[in-house]
Amino acid sequence: MKPLFATCARGFEELLKTELTELGAQDVRIAQGGVHFGADDETQYKTLLWSRLASRILLPIAQSKIYSDLDLYSTVVSQAWLEHFDERTHFFVDFNGTNREIRHSQFGAMRVKDGIVDYFERHGKARPNVDKENPDVRIHAYLNRDDLILSLDLSGEALHMRGYREDSGQAPLRETLAAALVLRSGWQKGTPLVDPMCGSGTLLIEAAQMEAQIAPQLHRSHWGFDFWKGHNQAVWEKVKAEAVALAEAQMEKNPLRNGEKGTVLCNPPYGERLGTTPALIALYSVFGQRLKQQFGGWNVSVFSSEQGLLDCLRMRSFRQFKAKNGPLDCVQKNYRISDRSSVQTDERAAENPAVSADSAHTDVATDFANRLQKNIKKIEKWAQQQGLDAYRLYDADLPDYNLAVDRYGDHIVVQEYAAPKNIDENKTRQRLLDAVTATLAVTGVETSKLILKVRRKQKGSNQYEKLANKGEYFYVTEYGAKLWVNLTDYLDTGLFLDHRLTRKMLGEMAKDKDFLNLFAYTGSATVHAALGGAKSTTTVDMSNTYLNWAEQNLILNDVDGKRHKLIQADCLQWLMRCDKQFDLIFVDPPTFSNSKRMEDSWDVQRDHIKLMKNLKRILRPNGTIVFSNNKRGFKMDFDGLAQLGLNALEISAKTLPLDFERNKQIHNCWLLTRKV
């Protein structure tokens, strides 16, 4: 009876213990990341051939305390390596772990290698060669703090490499993990197992091998024990022959019977796998509905890293298991679908042939779906009359659904507002997922054209922080102007929809005037002014990215560039240096900014009078300043304006379009002129 250690993914130790016991292992004890057990030669080979869960089977040959690299070397060089393999054998060292002295696993592996080759030289043998790609023998060294365990790896290649597939696909599921998922799913041999998202079929292949009693390593041609002197070829041939005979006997059986209820087991896409979030929300929602419609009386087991996506199934699990899929923390949830689920669905379909799984989308977030449908009916007709294809459909109308829904052509953007800290995070997440599901159903938009964003309170220029790098631009129309938008790369899209009427007004005011657009963003107001017949335009922003965007907006509208200047600068500093006069000035500064690129911090409430003073200096006698900002509760300093000789007329209500009429504080807007 020799001591062995079977490694496995964390969380599968109990399953592995049961499996090894069934294979005849003795003195089976769980450890972190594996299982200790004792075995004779026959059981040793059985565990190698038959274990579906073990990653490797190791034969420990030495244990020692390691306080320095010399201790490590001395331990290795003192082992009787010639009892295990000869000098013609190519070997490789796997070293895992560190301590205070052995700080890098690569250094540890090098010292183990040095000890082995020096041992052979001391015994008058040639130095064995190291082969990283195809070694004959693998040495496994594990260092935990100061405790070293040296082992021979009897497996060779890791045991998850079954050899039945060459292409792992886009989102591979390791075979040992797949086997564990099958065992934990509740599936019973002899009953159907369905994987509706099978990918390369790993789950089904592992289950089929269990059903047919095919040893998972039956087709492996190279083992870690092939060149090991302790290898018992006769016993190995016996164990392998028994496995072949069992598999052949099972091939003649057909244990599955039509009409039986069984188990649905799948590993659907999730965030780090394939697809985008809205598509996944739709997938899980429809999947849950289909399961309840078509699989009454079945068991269901779903493996995912996203709890929120599992919630979209809208089913209550009776058991769950945690597991790792590579670096991802995942969970496997088991469900039972009652027979009445499919019966009730069939009855609904009989009463109303129009009932389908797609209509079930609106069974979630019904209040939200009804409000969105009502808004669409009202707003889309108006938008068509106005010549708009970018507008807001929903803006936190209902307190339980704190989000905005915007249409940009044939795309939909769902923006979640940050919830108050006292609201349960899980509840907020579920409401968002339900709202996305309902939005897909109500709007009919393709899942690939629904973009989901999470908004947080922005400080300074953080609202311009890049989120992605897809570079996907398309244009929308607004009162005859064409404007580029990007729905994915930034938190904002390049177009503030609430300022639509302000831009239209600027276009109507700009004819034959010199126009200044300060804090210009992507220059959409400049486009309207240019199309409105402005004599010249000057567009100033601190961001080169947005100035380039503004330039592309002008080009898109065939605006002659000679009379239209684009200037990259700190707007406040540029304003102090500017000596040109303007007839019409549009200024829409941030509420607050402390950008490192600005010389001073900015607060619109604190600093707006100073801004007006500098603007008045470059404003022609009959000129107009259009001043806007987004600070809720902003109070104009009329006394300060009076001292500057300026009049202010608030026009906020006139600049609020129909699709923003419920949010009267989204911006405030003012006309400022010189006092006569």
UniProtKB/Swiss-Prot annotation:
Molecular-function annotations in GO: 23S rRNA (guanine(2445)-N(2))-methyltransferase activity; RNA binding; rRNA (guanine-N7-)-methyltransferase activity
Top-rank taxon, per record: Bacteria
SMART domains reported in the protein's UniProt record: THUMP
EC number: 2.1.1.173, 2.1.1.264
Reactions catalysed according to its record: guanosine(2445) in 23S rRNA + S-adenosyl-L-methionine = N(2)-methylguanosine(2445) in 23S rRNA + S-adenosyl-L-homocysteine + H(+); guanosine(2069) in 23S rRNA + S-adenosyl-L-methionine = N(2)-methylguanosine(2069) in 23S rRNA + S-adenosyl-L-homocysteine + H(+)
Disulfide-linked positions: none
Limits of the THUMP domain: 43-154
Functional description taken from the UniProt entry: Specifically methylates the guanine in position 2445 (m2G2445) and the guanine in position 2069 (m7G2069) of 23S rRNA.
Protein name as it appears in the record: Ribosomal RNA large subunit methyltransferase K/L
Organism: Actinobacillus succinogenes (strain ATCC 55618 / DSM 22257 / CCUG 43843 / 130Z)
